[in-house]
Every structure is written in C-alpha cells, then in structure tokens.
Amino acid sequence: MSGPIDRLIAQMRQAPRAVRFADAIKVAERYFGAARQKGSSHVVFKMPWLGDPRVNLQNDRGKAKACQVRQLLDAIDKLNREERDG
C-alpha cells in the first residue's frame, strides 16, 4: 500500500470510528464511481453486484458512521477478491 487511497483504507481498518466523512466518500468514489444519491446527510453508492446492493454513508458531525465504514471496507474486499479470482 502506497497511494493516498491505500493509506486512507489502512487508517479506516485501524480506526473505523475516526474516519472523516469526506475521506470515506473519497475512497468510495475511487472504487464505486460517483454517488447514486447525494445532497443530504446520506450519500449512496451502487455496488456492481446483482440485487442492486448499496453502501450508504452518513455524515455524523463530520465523521462517517463506523458500521458504514465497515460495510464500505467489506464491499471493497469483495470487489478485490472478485477481480483477483476472476
């Protein structure tokens, strides 16, 4: 891991409760593209899998909610596994 997004992901794994909302958005946009919905305290990203799954990120006084950070990390891990395994 060496790039800025990789460093953010490492920080997210270390302390999911301390993730800035803007950083979570930055990571999600890198992996899943533009948000499907934004403009409120919630930002929704569509996942590339069947069934229309989503990752929802919610601004909680400048921080992303820890449970949503973990969901984002799980989605990134799944995407990386699928790319690796074909």
Place the predicted regions along the sequence by residue:
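Basic nucleic-acid-binding interfaces
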Residues: S2-Q37, M47-G86
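Minor-groove-contacting beta-hairpin "wing" of winged helix-turn-helix DNA-binding domains
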Residues: H42-K46
